[in-house]
């Protein structure tokens, strides 16, 4: 998962694991997603997981022009916005109802993200949705 620090627009894609190829694929997908919204990723904060500390991930960040920093070990509050987004996703999407299967839950993820980004009020944004913080005609505002 990724969250834009300014707008709080969230992005999530499911991968089978947290190994290097998956985290690099996620990074590339996140960059493309945010670029489509007019957001350029300049800095990235991650935890200290082995995939994020790898040379492969460092090269991917460098190739994309992203400055990569790490949270302080054992201090998740260093990345509080991301941690809050994770908790919101768990509470409102993953565990927000009883799903018949994991596949059904995963199939509803795009609808939840569309709601979260374009319609869900956010207290830190004056009870406006994250898309309201994006400039111009972006896809979230056009499709809401």
Language model segments and positions:
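Active-site beta-loop-alpha junctions of metal-dependent nucleic acid enzymes
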Residues: 13-37
């Amino acid at each position: 998962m990724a969250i834009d620090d300014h707008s709080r627009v969230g992005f999530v894609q499911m991968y089978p694991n947290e190994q290097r190829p998956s985290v690099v694929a996620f990074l590339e997908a996140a960059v493309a997603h945010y670029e489509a919204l007019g957001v350029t990723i300049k800095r990235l904060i991650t935890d200290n997981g082995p995939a994020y500390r790898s040379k492969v991930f460092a090269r991917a960040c460098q190739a994309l022009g992203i400055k990569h920093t790490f949270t302080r070990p054992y201090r998740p509050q260093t990345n509080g916005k991301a941690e809050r987004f994770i908790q919101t996703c768990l509470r409102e999407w993953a565990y927000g109802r009883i799903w018949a299967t994991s596949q059904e839950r995963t199939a509803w993820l795009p609808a939840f993200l569309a709601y979260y980004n374009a319609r869900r009020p956010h207290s830190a944004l004056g009870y406006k949705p994250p898309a309201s913080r994006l400039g111009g005609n972006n896809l979230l505002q056009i499709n809401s």
